[in-house]
Regions:
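Active-site capping/gating regions of soluble enzymes
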Residues: 1-121
Length: 121
């Protein structure tokens, strides 16, 4: 498996690419350089928000008919909301766990190309 970043806009650009454009550019690049016998590609979130990382992964999987499985290996984009909800307090563990579960579920749906923004709380 490979563990790359997605092709996203640079920090100095004034325009923001759509998730569809990011997906198309990323997949186009990989089709040129990644052998079809590579079993999977797991993406890093690389400076994206939680929602951006999920939406971009979803858009790539919606392209369909790809030779690789596309999934995620997110750190911050999987944990940030849960850590914020927890804030190191025992009394926040339940909400933090639910927050983490939600984010994991959203990313799981994105690996299937079945995530929709309406599913976000």
């Amino acid at each position: 498996c490979l563990k790359p970043n997605m092709i996203i806009d640079g920090t100095l650009t004034s325009e923001k690419s759509s998730s569809k454009t990011i997906a198309e550019k990323t997949i186009s690049c990989f089709k040129e350089v990644v052998p079809e016998d590579v079993p999977g590609i797991v993406f890093l979130s690389g400076g994206q928000t939680e929602i951006e990382a999920t939406e971009n992964l979803d858009q790539m999987n919606k392209i369909g008919n790809l030779p690789w499985n596309l999934s995620f290996s997110y750190g911050r984009a999987l944990q940030a909301s849960a850590l914020q909800a927890w804030s190191g307090k025992v009394e926040n563990e339940e909400i933090a766990s639910a927050t983490f579960d939600h984010r994991a579920k959203m990313n799981s749906l994105a690996t299937l190309g079945k995530w929709e923004s309406e599913l976000e709380k």
